[in-house]
C-alpha cells in the first residue's frame, strides 16, 4: 500500500498533508496523535472510504478494516457475519470463531454478544477476508483492561499466523508496542507524519 497525499481539507480548512506512507504485507505501523488531528481521516483515505483528497493511493494488497465500534450484520449470526461478506467457508469461519474465543456462539446474533465479544467477532471477520493489510481504528478503546489485553494478544497471534501487515490508529503507544508496530506521529496543522 502506498499513499502520497498532497492535501485533505474540510471546506477551506486543510487538515492533512503532505503525507507519504508505504506499508507492505507483514509490516506494522501505528498512527499516533491527539484527538482530532486526522488519524481516522487518514485511515479512511487508505481504506478507500474517503476519496476527497489530493494525491495518489495505490493498494495492491487486499485490505480489511476493524472500526472502533463493531460494524456487524445485525440480522445475521456470528458464523454468517464471517462467511457472507468474506466468502470464507463455514469450516474456516468456525475455526476463526474458536480462535477468538467464540466457539459455541456460531448461532448467536450480534445483539446477543457483549461488546468484547462483538469486537472479537469483528476481528475474526477481518481475518476471514485474508487481508494483506489490516486497518484498525482504535479497536481497543473503551474496553476494560483484561478484555483489551486479550484483544491485543488475539490480534498479535492472528497477524503472526496470517502474515498480514497492520496500520493501527491509537492514542496509546503501549498498544503499538504490544503489536510490534512502528509508531508514526501525526501532528501539526495541517497534520503531517513524523
Features from the language model and the residues they span:
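Helix-to-loop junction immediately C-terminal to a conserved catalytic motif
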Residues: 47
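Conserved ABC ATPase signature
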Residues: 109-113, 117
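Hydrophobic anchor residue at the start of the ABC signature
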Residues: 123
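A short, proline-enriched helix->beta-strand linker immediately N-terminal to the Walker B motif
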Residues: 128-132
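Catalytic Walker B motif of ABC-type/P-loop ATPase nucleotide-binding domains
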Residues: 134-138
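Helix N-cap at the start of a conserved alpha-helix in ABC-type nucleotide-binding domains
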Residues: 145-147
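Conserved H-loop
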Residues: 163-169
Amino acid at each position: 500500500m502506498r499513499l502520497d497525499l498532497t492535501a485533505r481539507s474540510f471546506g477551506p480548512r486543510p487538515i492533512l498533508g503532505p503525507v507519504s506512507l508505504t506499508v507492505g504485507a507483514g509490516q506494522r505501523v501505528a498512527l499516533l496523535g491527539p484527538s482530532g488531528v486526522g488519524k481516522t481521516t487518514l485511515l479512511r483515505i487508505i481504506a478507500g472510504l474517503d476519496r476527497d483528497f489530493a494525491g495518489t493511493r495505490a493498494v495492491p494488497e487486499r485490505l480489511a478494516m476493524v472500526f472502533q465500534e463493531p460494524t456487524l450484520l445485525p440480522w445475521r449470526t456470528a458464523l454468517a457475519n464471517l462467511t457472507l461478506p468474506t466468502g470464507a467457508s463455514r469450516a474456516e469461519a468456525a475455526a476463526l470463531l474458536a480462535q477468538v474465543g467464540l466457539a459455541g456462539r456460531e448461532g448467536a446474533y450480534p445483539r446477543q454478544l457483549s461488546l468484547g465479544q462483538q469486537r472479537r467477532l469483528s476481528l475474526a471477520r477481518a481475518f476471514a477476508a485474508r487481508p494483506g493489510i489490516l486497518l484498525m481504528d482504535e479497536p481497543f478503546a473503551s474496553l476494560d483492561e483484561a478484555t483489551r489485553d486479550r484483544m491485543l494478544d488475539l490480534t498479535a497471534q492472528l497477524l503472526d499466523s496470517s502474515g498480514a501487515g497492520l496500520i493501527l490508529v491509537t492514542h496509546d503507544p503501549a498498544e503499538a508496542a504490544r503489536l510490534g508496530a512502528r509508531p508514526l506521529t501525526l501532528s501539526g496543522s495541517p497534520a503531517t507524519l513524523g
